[in-house]
Amino acid sequence: MSEHPLPASVAATLEQGLASMGLDAALAPPLLRYLALLHRWNGTYNLTAIRDPQEMVTRHLLDSLAMQPFVADGSLADLGTGPGLPGIPLAIACPGLQVTLVESNGKKARFMREAVRQLGLGNARVAESRAEALDEAGHYDQLTARAMDTLAGIVRVGGHLLRPGGVLLAMKGVYPHEEIAELPAGWQVREVTPLSVPGLAGERHLVTVTGP
């Protein structure tokens, strides 16, 4: 956004991060447009507690994109997506993915609709709804959740959206031993994958869960 330019160092950090993750450098311009829009709106609407654009690159964009190698083409519902994380970065990086951004907060949903419009993301749509109220049972190949509840809680509110054979991809910090043990009957962990996010010191794990 020309009226709210990001420092050159922000673009450099993103480009270096994409390179270290083996992702296409062509993703940088649309990701920076999204970041500039998020930074601008955040000043008024408090969409995220992270204010520094440099930190947003690491903790929002690169963290979201760390799961990209595990996402398949098809349909995906991003539950409790907030301002569109990881859903919008994944929609940018995966043109064969149809992303539904599920968020009940009105101001965050309005921001995402504007971001989708400005970015021309034909493979993303916003569902302003709580996950448990979304009447699209069995509609999705994949569910994602990055900062939403325990594994059992995610399954409880969003499990109905997953088609038979579909998977939940949940981003977690440290290895979630207790959460895995508390999954409802029929839900099984297929894999827990440690993730490396450039510039992020803390542990990150992607938990892949299959339904009954």
Curated annotation (Swiss-Prot):
Its subcellular locations are: Cytoplasm
Give the E.C. number(s).
2.1.1.170
Major location, coarse class?
cytoplasm
Question: Which UniProt keywords are given for this protein, alphabetically ordered?
Answer: Cytoplasm, Methyltransferase, rRNA processing, S-adenosyl-L-methionine, Transferase
Q: Does the keyword Cell membrane apply?
A: no
Q: Which Pfam families match?
A: GidB
Q: Which residues bind S-adenosyl-L-methionine?
A: G80, L85, A131, E132, R146
**Reaction equations catalysed:** guanosine(527) in 16S rRNA + S-adenosyl-L-methionine = N(7)-methylguanosine(527) in 16S rRNA + S-adenosyl-L-homocysteine
The Gene Ontology CC terms held by the record are: cytosol
Taxonomically, the superkingdom here is Bacteria
Task: Please name the GO terms that the record assigns under molecular function.
Answer: rRNA (guanine-N7-)-methyltransferase activity
Give the EC class as a word: transferase
Keyword check for Metal-binding: no
Q: Which family does it belong to?
A: Belongs to the methyltransferase superfamily. RNA methyltransferase RsmG family.
NCBIfam families xrefs: rsmG_gidB
Record PANTHER family? S-ADENOSYL-L-METHIONINE-DEPENDENT METHYLTRANSFERASES SUPERFAMILY PROTEIN (PTHR31760:SF0)
Q: What does this protein do?
A: Specifically methylates the N7 position of guanine in position 527 of 16S rRNA.
Q: What is this protein called?
A: Ribosomal RNA small subunit methyltransferase G
Query: By which gene is this protein encoded?
Result: rsmG
